[in-house]
């Protein structure tokens, strides 16, 4: 009875918005809510149906009394099957724990990525224009530039391969 009262008090819209659910998770929750509402509605309809059967009317109509007696005996001895739903509840709880763990891991990754992006944005906003940078500052930002330049100079090459093709020859003859 307590579970039924708790199920009636669930605010589905608040769950979706407060947890910030989107995409597949929100769709799954909405599908679950629909199945829950359909099952509750069907249970309500079935509980309102009368369960009494007038066997005397059947006895007066039918000639074969043995069939009516057999059906009445089975009807009175019928007990609805009860199911142990503990296994399903444990599976749902395990799924919930796993989903929460995955959500927290995703939140941690997103927070780290946001911090990294904020740091990158700050660097971009505070960076000096390229034409104001010195050669030493560019080399400090990308150490491989010094290594490549040293290799080219040690081989006696004073121009960068592909530079003239890309930017043209600016030398005045």
UniProtKB/Swiss-Prot annotation:
Cited Gene3D superfamilies: 6.10.280.70
Record's protein name: ATP synthase subunit d, mitochondrial
Key words of the record: ATP synthesis, CF(0), Hydrogen ion transport, Ion transport, Membrane, Mitochondrion, Mitochondrion inner membrane, Transport
Main function: Mitochondrial membrane ATP synthase (F(1)F(0) ATP synthase or Complex V) produces ATP from ADP in the presence of a proton gradient across the membrane which is generated by electron transport complexes of the respiratory chain. F-type ATPases consist of two structural domains, F(1) - containing the extramembraneous catalytic core, and F(0) - containing the membrane proton channel, linked together by a central stalk and a peripheral stalk. During catalysis, ATP synthesis in the catalytic domain of F(1) is coupled via a rotary mechanism of the central stalk subunits to proton translocation.
One of the Pfam families matching this protein, by short name: Mt_ATP-synt_D
Membrane disposition: Peripheral membrane protein
InterPro entries from the UniProt entry: ATP_synth_F0_dsu_mt (IPR008689), ATP_synth_F0_dsu_sf_mt (IPR036228)
Record localization: Mitochondrion inner membrane
